[in-house]
Amino acid sequence: MTHADDDGLVLPPRVAAAHVALMPIFRSEQEKSSVMEYTQNLARQLQDVSYHNRPLVVEIDDREIGGVRGWDWIRKGIPIRVEIGPRDMAAESVFMARRDRPHKDRVSITRNEFVARIPEILDEMQKNLFERALAFQKGNTVKIDGKDAFYAYFTPKNSEQPEIHGGFALAHWCSSNACESRIKEDLSVTIRSIP
């Protein structure tokens, strides 16, 4: 699947319902007040940015449940997760993670650079996800001509532990529901797309 990994959904930025999740981090009421103000100001700045003719959609998640917030956004596939704590605020920076990269791959970036580069970052993510999907498709597509070749390809070599053929087969079809039912019964193969 091209829009998911072991951690959850991976949404291309152009189709994501929201683009950025801001997660303020604080330990006291005093920190909360200043970090929340910084976070809300950053959210307003980001919402003024246009991404492919629509304003950026920004979520502020101020739940006080630590790492659960981050994993919630990873599973939901939000393109960019941003953590903001007192140190980030003092340095006028943010701690950013991209959903197209491993979840531990996070970087500190200045607030101004982040706001200025967010459309570029999202476009780079869009391109990376498309190229990854295209490479998967090309690397997992086999062309099959003829019924015998089709059955040979999908018949398990070892019926005790049948191999999984994940991917795509470009094959001819006789346009008969009976033919499709027979292939499904014999090989557990189903038609996904008919041009």
What are these regions (language model features)?
Residues 1-195:
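NTP/phosphate- and nucleic-acid-binding module
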